A protein has these predicted regions:
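Hydrophobic, aromatic-enriched alpha-helical segments typical of multi-pass transmembrane helices
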Residues: 1-166
């Protein structure tokens, strides 16, 4: 699915901008590989917490895993740069009219939805609304959800556009 999204986003950019397309595509491929690696690492940390909990106590296991994750975070954060470029280049190209979509599609762009979905729990907390599990899930799945919103919007646009061209 991720590779399909990388190719689809890249295909949206006008052919005249080969350098931007190439950078965006390479960042996309790197993002797919790194995302799989990071998600596997996070799952491994969850497994360690589950495994260690009964053996050394839940609090000690959580402290050990959290300390390790905190120590690794500075090494992991730069790996998100290609993902920012993958979506950022597409966002800018859409904003300046260099894709096949009208600017109105910005309302469905992964950057917009990712920011919205990731911000909802923070906004709720600022409004002193009790944070619920669904808010955490929304925040943690924001990129995947944002990609799905874009794919649906792009499919609807393409269907309407094709019907309009057909007559």
């Amino acid at each position: 699915l991720y590779y399909f999204v990388v190719k689809a986003l890249n295909a949206d950019i006008d052919e005249k901008y080969r350098k931007a397309k190439k950078i965006q595509f390479l960042c996309g491929i790197f993002t797919v590989a790194i995302a799989l690696t990071i998600h596997t690492w996070v799952a491994t940390m969850a497994w360690f917490a589950t495994y260690l909990g009964p053996r050394i106590g839940a609090e000690a296991a959580l402290a050990a895993v959290t300390t390790y994750q905190d120590a690794m975070l500075p090494a992991i954060l730069p790996l998100y740069l290609p993902m920012l470029l993958l979506f950022g280049i597409h966002f800018v190209m859409l904003l300046i009219g260099k894709t096949r979509y009208p600017r109105g599609m910005l309302a469905f762009h992964p950057v917009m939805w990712n920011l919205l979905l990731a911000a909802v729990p923070d906004i709720a907390q600022a409004m002193q609304v009790p944070v619920a599990t669904w808010m955490s899930v929304m925040s943690q799945s924001s990129t995947n959800s944002a990609i799905m919103v874009w794919c649906i919007a792009a499919a609807v646009y393409e269907k309407k556009h094709a019907a309009h061209l057909a007559g």
